């Protein structure tokens, strides 16, 4: 196998129907207050992981949690995974701070996130 190795799961996004109630549950679970608390997104850092809550699935239309794998080169990784049979769901986009995200679906329809920090 050639290509670039991932650097592990960086972020897991969870679609939620009630952001305030979900924020309370995840604060209790993780034992920390949110580090980002907006009407469109609540994010936590705990144990070296980022956990995000997205009301109504957000612009990505999430219907289940999505793990975002950190990669050194998002375009190269997209080329590798699509050559292996994945389909691009959302092309790379900058979500702020130089962070690029994209999603693909595997052969069974599972959504996989890719994340590149600059």
Where are these regions (language model features)?
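Short glycine-/small-residue-rich flexible loop motifs, especially phosphate/cofactor-binding loops
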Residues: 23-24, 41, 78-79
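Vicinal oxygen chelate
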Residues: 1-5, 8-17, 45, 59-118, ...
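Conserved acetyl-CoA-binding loop of GNAT-fold acetyltransferases
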Residues: 29-34, 85-87
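N-terminal beta-strand motif that seeds the catalytic metal site of vicinal oxygen chelate
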Residues: 1-23, 48-50, 65-67, 117-118
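Conserved active-site alpha-helix within GNAT-family acetyltransferase domains
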Residues: 20-29, 102, 111
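Conserved short beta-strand elements that form part of the metal-binding/catalytic scaffold
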Residues: 32-65, 111-116
